[in-house]
Amino acid sequence: MTYKLILLRHGHSEWNAKNLFTGWVDVDLNDQGRAEAARGGELLVENNILPDVLYTSLLKRAINTANIALDKADRGWIPVKRDWRLNERHYGALQGKDKAQTLAEYGEEQFMEWRRSYDTPPPPLDDNSEFSQAHDPRYADLGDALPRTECLKDVLVRILPYWESDIKADLKAGKTVLVTAHGNSLRALVKHLDGISDEAIAGLNIPTGIPLVYDLDDDFQPVKPGGTYLDPEAAEQAILAVANQGKK
């Protein structure tokens, strides 16, 4: 038996367009992102891959991407599970900062270490910052678990228990699962699925709005490592654009 998992990074956001570090700041999609989300839903229909259950983060850019895609696929009625553990990586004190300015200020080596290394987080975000989530009611129950900064390793640590307890359980029940989340939370999950090394994960980019489908075997190993993008040509072009963020 194989299990079907669909990963969908949220569409282009207002801060993607402004080239800002976003993290846990709850910005919305822009027009491009809404169009990407709609196209993502159309791709699901065209390939007859329709989800039975949806997982999203608590951030509106992922929630709205899922809503638009599911509306296009006429699957707005499926069960929805939202959890903070699918949130984007917390970028600490970099949240709200311009990527190009950060690159110019700190140099490429430090910039890339913060942005792409597996285990080096940026400096923590002060709770009094306008970009802090310390007083956000959706995280009121987290207590000390609320991050002030994260590296990709931290994201993997929070996602894996949720993958094991919830997402995998729905897959085992024979459901086609859609996870609509973020660049780094999805990179962490793909790292686990594909067994990508701590070093190689730095080179993995996930494009916005293009469904990535994994067929998993009985041991939850990918039948095809890396999965399959439902629009491979668009994915290749978009991956290059993601890789070049901050260099303009």
Swiss-Prot record:
Pathway given for this chain reads: Carbohydrate degradation; glycolysis; pyruvate from D-glyceraldehyde 3-phosphate: step 3/5
Recorded hits in Pfam families, A to Z, give: His_Phos_1
Coiled coil segments of this chain: none
Query: Does this UniProt record's set of keywords contain Isomerase?
Result: yes
* InterPro entries per UniProt: His_Pase_superF_clade-1, His_PPase_superfam, Phosphogly_mut1
Reactions listed under catalytic activity? (2R)-2-phosphoglycerate = (2R)-3-phosphoglycerate
The source's domain of life comes to Bacteria
Which key words tag this protein in UniProt? Answer: Gluconeogenesis, Glycolysis, Isomerase
Site residues, Transition state stabilizer? H182
For this protein, what is any one GO molecular function term? phosphoglycerate mutase activity
EC numbers: 5.4.2.11
Active site annotation, chain numbering? H10, E88
CDD domains attached to this UniProt entry = HP_PGM_like
* UniProt: substrate binding residues: 9-16, 22-23, 61, 88-91, 99, 115-116, 183-184
Which BP terms from GO are recorded?
Answer: gluconeogenesis; glycolytic process
Family stated for the protein in its record: Belongs to the phosphoglycerate mutase family. BPG-dependent PGAM subfamily.
What does this gene product do?
Catalyzes the interconversion of 2-phosphoglycerate and 3-phosphoglycerate.
Q: Can you say what this protein is called?
A: 2,3-bisphosphoglycerate-dependent phosphoglycerate mutase
**Organism field:** Pseudarthrobacter chlorophenolicus (strain ATCC 700700 / DSM 12829 / CIP 107037 / JCM 12360 / KCTC 9906 / NCIMB 13794 / A6)
